[in-house]
């Protein structure tokens, strides 16, 4: 029984790491627009779900969680470009998602040079055959 539990744990960890390989993240700060940019580069054949899908349907929407910092103020929520809207046979529903790459942005209203914006992104990827379990990826963005 312990061996089976260990094997299941190993497989779960392995598939989570595999999901991270399907999406490469780049986190940066744009000084001219004063916004953070959270860019996902998605492997061919895979797609990343929008923040704005109904999570009761099945797939986990992409979400961003920010660590509290009294020296940093945001203006509004995380924005995303227009997503692909298609019927998904696996979930038997029309869903919004991104292929290839997508850049999410959030306007920074107040932050001093040297401040660090920290948090994590939670996301899930699928292809035509399968979905990988949701993954959290930490980020840290220094204001120049």
Residue ranges and their predicted role:
Residues 4-13:
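Sec-dependent N-terminal signal peptides
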Residues 20-144:
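Extracellular/lumen-exposed scaffold segments
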